[in-house]
Amino acid sequence: MSKILIVNSVYYTEIANLLLEGATDKFKGNNIGYEIIKAPGTFEIPAAILFAVKGKNTNYDGYLALGCVIRGETDHYKYVCKGVIEGLNAIVMHHAIPLGMGIITADSKDKALIRADKNKKNVGGHAASTVLHMIDLHNKLK
């Protein structure tokens, strides 16, 4: 059985809960073990995953990043999005780990809620499917 580390940003609690529900439903349906840790914001997700990758007492088959960044009135949105995507990409490229990225970037909370809801866009569920696919691919190519 595969074991996944889910790093869930809790900055937008309602969205975080929806993302997590979509992801864990996918894992339960596939008999996948998982552990959940909370990051204070989406920007902190890459660091949390790197802590686990470099940790001596962790043994995960894959990683799932769940979070949301909503556009505001300043450039903060642009820099957070760029930092998160580049941070996750660097970890994947340097450590060759299976990762699913369920990071919602949206212009409004309403749009983010639609993307997070498992009965609508289900970003969390799709990201969970991605990490499972990447674990299979990783195992085939090792």
Curated annotation (Swiss-Prot):
<feature type="active site" description="Proton donor">
    <location>
        <position position="76"/>
    </location>
</feature>
<comment type="pathway">
    <text>Cofactor biosynthesis; riboflavin biosynthesis; riboflavin from 2-hydroxy-3-oxobutyl phosphate and 5-amino-6-(D-ribitylamino)uracil: step 1/2.</text>
</comment>
<dbReference type="InterPro" id="IPR034964">
    <property type="entry name" value="LS"/>
</dbReference>
<dbReference type="GO" id="GO:0005829">
    <property type="term" value="C:cytosol"/>
</dbReference>
<dbReference type="Pfam" id="PF00885">
    <property type="entry name" value="DMRL_synthase"/>
</dbReference>
<feature type="binding site">
    <location>
        <position position="101"/>
    </location>
    <ligand>
        <name>5-amino-6-(D-ribitylamino)uracil</name>
    </ligand>
</feature>
<comment type="function">
    <text>Catalyzes the formation of 6,7-dimethyl-8-ribityllumazine by condensation of 5-amino-6-(D-ribitylamino)uracil with 3,4-dihydroxy-2-butanone 4-phosphate. This is the penultimate step in the biosynthesis of riboflavin.</text>
</comment>
<feature type="binding site">
    <location>
        <position position="11"/>
    </location>
    <ligand>
        <name>5-amino-6-(D-ribitylamino)uracil</name>
    </ligand>
</feature>
<dbReference type="GO" id="GO:0009231">
    <property type="term" value="P:riboflavin biosynthetic process"/>
</dbReference>
<keyword id="KW-0808">Transferase</keyword>
<protein>
    <recommendedName>
        <fullName>6,7-dimethyl-8-ribityllumazine synthase</fullName>
        <ecNumber>2.5.1.78</ecNumber>
    </recommendedName>
</protein>
<dbReference type="InterPro" id="IPR036467">
    <property type="entry name" value="LS/RS_sf"/>
</dbReference>
<keyword id="KW-0686">Riboflavin biosynthesis</keyword>
<feature type="binding site">
    <location>
        <begin position="73"/>
        <end position="74"/>
    </location>
    <ligand>
        <name>(2S)-2-hydroxy-3-oxobutyl phosphate</name>
    </ligand>
</feature>
<feature type="binding site">
    <location>
        <begin position="42"/>
        <end position="44"/>
    </location>
    <ligand>
        <name>5-amino-6-(D-ribitylamino)uracil</name>
    </ligand>
</feature>
<dbReference type="GO" id="GO:0009349">
    <property type="term" value="C:riboflavin synthase complex"/>
</dbReference>
<feature type="binding site">
    <location>
        <position position="115"/>
    </location>
    <ligand>
        <name>(2S)-2-hydroxy-3-oxobutyl phosphate</name>
    </ligand>
</feature>
<dbReference type="InterPro" id="IPR002180">
    <property type="entry name" value="LS/RS"/>
</dbReference>
<dbReference type="GO" id="GO:0000906">
    <property type="term" value="F:6,7-dimethyl-8-ribityllumazine synthase activity"/>
</dbReference>
<feature type="binding site">
    <location>
        <begin position="68"/>
        <end position="70"/>
    </location>
    <ligand>
        <name>5-amino-6-(D-ribitylamino)uracil</name>
    </ligand>
</feature>
<comment type="similarity">
    <text>Belongs to the DMRL synthase family.</text>
</comment>
